[in-house]
UniProtKB/Swiss-Prot annotation:
EC number: 2.4.1.18
Catalytic activity: Transfers a segment of a (1->4)-alpha-D-glucan chain to a primary hydroxy group in a similar glucan chain
Top-rank lineage group of the source organism: Bacteria
Organism of this sequence: Haemophilus influenzae (strain ATCC 51907 / DSM 11121 / KW20 / Rd)
This protein's pathway: Glycan biosynthesis; glycogen biosynthesis
Subunit relationships: Monomer.
Family annotation (InterPro entries): A-amylase/branching_C (IPR006048), Branching_enzy (IPR037439), GlgB (IPR006407), GlgB_N (IPR054169), GlgB_N_E_set_prok (IPR044143), Glyco_hydro_13_cat_dom (IPR006047), Glyco_hydro_13_N (IPR004193), Glyco_hydro_b (IPR013780)
Pfam families reported in the protein's UniProt record: Alpha-amylase, Alpha-amylase_C, CBM_48, GlgB_N
A single GO BP: glycogen biosynthetic process
Name the record gives this protein: 1,4-alpha-glucan branching enzyme GlgB
Keyword set, alphabetical order: Carbohydrate metabolism, Glycogen biosynthesis, Glycogen metabolism, Glycosyltransferase, Transferase
Gene name tied to this protein: glgB
Family from the record: Belongs to the glycosyl hydrolase 13 family. GlgB subfamily.
Amino acid sequence: MTTAVTQAIIDGFFDASNGDPFATLGMHETEQGIEIRTLLPDANRMVVIERESGKEITELDCVDERGFFVGVIPNCRQFFAYQLQVFWGNEAQIIEDPYRFHPMIDDLEQWLLSEGSMLRPYEVLGAHFMECDGVSGVNFRLWAPNARRVSIVGDFNYWDGRRHPMRFHSKSGVWELFLPKASLGQLYKFELIDCHGNLRLKADPFAFSSQLRPDTASQVSALPNVVEMTEARKKANQGNQPISIYEVHLGSWRRNLENNFWLDYDQIADELIPYVKEMGFTHIEFLPLSEFPFDGSWGYQPLGLYSPTSRFGSPEAFRRLVKRAHEAGINVILDWVPGHFPSDTHGLVAFDGTALYEHEDPREGYHQDWNTLIYNYGRNEVKNFLSSNALYWLERFGVDGIRVDAVASMIYRDYSRAEGEWIPNQYGGRENLEAIEFLKHTNWKIHSEMAGAISIAEESTSFAGVTHPSENGGLGFNFKWNMGWMNDTLAYMKLDPIYRQYHHNKMTFGMVYQYSENFVLPLSHDEVVHGKYSLLGKMPGDTWQKFANLRAYYGYMWGYPGKKLLFMGNEFAQGREWNYEESLDWFLLDENIGGGWHKGVLKLVKDLNQIYQKNRPLFELDNSPEGFDWLVVDDAANSVLAFERRSSNGERIIVVSNFTPVPRHNYRIGVNVAGKYEEILNTDSMYYEGSNVGNFGCVASEQIESHGRENSISVSIPPLATVYLRLKTK
């Protein structure tokens, strides 16, 4: 039998300190019969109504004028479905009592959550609109094992933490309450009394929608339906296919011309998708779109990991954007940030008064570079929260891949730390073993549950096996950004051509380790901010030379083994650094303003993408020595490089680059196969605003030995240019 309700228990509800509401509220069996107890602050009267018949059963006694009611139904021994008729002054309202509903989380779910092995915890935790016993409402669940009390507050209860305290499940540390009549679109938060007795107001870590900053509430939103992976999308992600990625920051790609405000997801779809298709990119990569509080972080300090940012519209609108990309044959990659989170008080920091998501010791849990907190990957629930988030974006929005940010900062405990500022692992080493295991687990989950989706690592060190299968000891990524190639080649391109001969190895060294990983060649947003200048701004020389250098570099990059990534604005050589608060400088494409230079680069990138997609030698064997051969690698004095790309069926393309402003006429290059070679690309073409030096469309080999080969071709290599010569097969 249930014990009597004491005044101390009642006071606990009104000072919002009662952590076990179901022990008191709802229906309880007593010697006299079923006793019903309700808490409704400021109510005057309360009548119990049988839900099925609508019959009045009894009026409850007000035992505390603040709004606590108790009544016994004599001789009643069975629980039944009931409603409450509440009188607020002279007005009456019929409501459902959330404390008459049984727990909806079962023992297996609790065990899986605690073990961290539930594949999709977002199907259980968070806010889920549903129906229970014929009553519609929202089931709220929150993991906060050390909180003394948790209440749900929101639009539905005047944000009053006294009204809806939640049920605690000690097996899992999960708090739960089904709130009848709560509905989609309503705002909510969790009000906690933490383990120290402090009051905290927290957004839902599993919220599917969140308010736009500076507001911080979560919003009840439907869990999106699963988007099935198609064979076409799978094929486009494979390593033997052409992958050319257009990296986009949605807030600054284009803006409203009248007020400089963002376009929404649908407007972006109308403009971005046709543009990307026309330019020949195969993939779009979005900078992070999980909800984040600070615009200046570009999304790399997220708090609402399960909420597409409301800056550009609703979650459903983002799904439409992805769908539009798929309809155009374009795959979508999303930047994903599991490495750290900001310390905003409504977020994950000290969630229940303890370091729940982060490490307690700042030597493990504080990121000095970004003033953020580092996840505790060794905690089962945290690891599962993160790894399942990757699966959520892939399954529920149809995203085709994720690019994991700042992997090096995750896998090394001493990353950006001086001696004494970090804690070694259990073996005394610098590797973060828990983070490494987390990455392996996440990639396993992605590849086992969403076959065909890809993961890409931004990993800036020489950590071995980033793209090797996790079962073979690798991290399990599909691709890794080739930061070494990017840094070396950009350092070379910044040099005055006079000095390039002394740094020739910067353009060739990448082939020493080319086959150690599966690489993406990235010219990303990081290279055009914080005083680094734009790509065009990095190039030496006058205007003609700057543009010629950039065109030659792009030609070299698209010919070099590895998938391609180009940040928005670089496709038309924007002159200033990227500014996240403004649109790109599209006006430069007006020839009256840009003089045709920028449009020439735009045309080149479009042609590079088209040639890349149509010619198997340029992509099929990126990760095999069979697909590449240096023809001229040692001509540092002339800053000339030449290599051959091959496909599995014997097709061949020779890539020749001249990184000086001196044209090289009658330059002889040994070739592996005799025949005619047609010039399919020349970055010095007048079509791209070049000087139009070339080879009249074709060159034929001669039986003249050169570079250790019996046959050779004599070519004209334009100044500061790259040309592609394809072996004719007919």
